[in-house]
Amino acid sequence: MQSHLFGRMPDGAPVHAYTLRDPGGLTACVIQYGARLAALEVPVAAGVRNVTLGFETLEPYLADGAHLGAVAGRYANRIAGGRFTLDGREYRLSVNNGNNTLHGGRVGFAHHVWQAESDGESLLLTHVSPDGDQGFPGTLTTQVRYRLQGDALVIDYEARTDAPTVVNLTHHAYFNLAGAGTVMDHAIAVAADRYLPVNADLIPTGELRPVAGTAFDLRRMTRIGDRIEADDAQLRLGGGFDHCFVLADAPHPAVQPAARVEAEGIVMEVLTTEPAVQLYTGNFLSGQPFAWRTGLCLETQHFPDSPHHPAFPSTVLRPGQTFWSRTVYRFGAA
């Protein structure tokens, strides 16, 4: 594994980039800032192709509001109203998405420099979020491990707390298997027969709605451009897909299929231990520098806004417990 100085924070703190290489040709570049995946090169007939959106220097990441390639936490996705109640006590959070908290608040995990250590084959990144950070209770120690395994990128997440809290971790890589252009010609399948409809703030209503007979039925390979403009109220709310698909009723100890994407000779399979995956089609990318819908995210996670929905799988983490999950991105020829 190689490393180099990627840039410096405004206070002068160094940020390093680490390059993981597999003999089969898969290469990943990960930076300490936000534990972000800055590039992922996949072997193709003509050489290699970078299939994620990212920057070559640190400065654009410091101004990035799209969470490009970042680990999102301590609570990925949205919490309605920027508040929740746990064990009878209400906690008020920093809000950064209207009146709601998105991806952990104004200064979530994506905006911190993580400690990094390598054993030569994997990269372990650690971040300690203090009690009260963005309003969340408990000191939370989070570790994310990146490793390459043949044709796959494997990401493991682990977290521990010293006081009851809520945790939802995900990865916000934007994929474009063509390496350029929009993702409208990408074909996708999602292994879910239900999804979570949302309100105007993109907060789940609490319903688990069957996908059958709707624009959200992606159980078979479907060209994104053929579905994203369907006459569907939910698609209009999100400006496209920005919805959570239900994979299982509870986390699984072993990875299960979540999604499959194909474009320009590359197929990507996503497998996870998590109960859901958020499909986001880059509807809010503004064109500086990445244009509208030029990347798609498959954010494996627990359900958004779970603290307000007792019927959803719990995201509560207590002292003595360990949060753990794994997501695998496997690549091959289409």
Language model region names:
Residues 1-334:
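An exposed, glycine/acidic-rich loop-and-rim segment of catalytic or binding clefts
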